[in-house]
C-alpha cells in the first residue's frame, strides 16, 4: 500500500466523476477506513463518505430491528444488510445524485488501472431500466467481462451502483425511522 500512496496515478482520469461513494466501515476497524481513503486519494475520488456500519458479529442488533428478528439470516448478515440500508437512507437524505456507489471497506480499486474505458463510459452503457449494477463480485472462478444480467454465482455487496428509484424502494420497504424491518423473507447472499 505504501507504493500506492507514493506513485503518481496516470490512470486517475478513469474514475473522474465516480461517485458519490458511500463506504461502509465498522467503527472498530479504522485501518480499513484508512486503506479506503488511501485508495480514494490515489484515484483522485473526492466525492466519498464513510458510513458507520452495524456490527452483527458480536452485537445483538435486535434494538434496531422492527418486527420479528429474521430467522433465516445470521447476525453478520443482519449487520451487513442493515448497514447497506443505512447507507442508502443516508444517500437519499443527503444527495440529489441520480445514483450512488455503495462500497465496503475491503474493496480494492487496483484493477481500475487495467480498464480500457472510463467510469463515464461504463455508466453510459448501463441499460435504460437498470436498478443496481454490481461492480465487484466474489470470484468463483468464472469471470464475465461484459455487462450482463445476474448469473447465479455473481454475488457480493463489495461494490455496486444503485439508482435513486431502487434505493427509495428498498428504504421504503425495509426502513421504519431508525429501525429496519427484515421479516419479509429477506435472505441476502453476501
Predicted stretch roles:
Residues 1-103, 107-190:
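An acidic/histidine-cluster motif and surrounding catalytic segment
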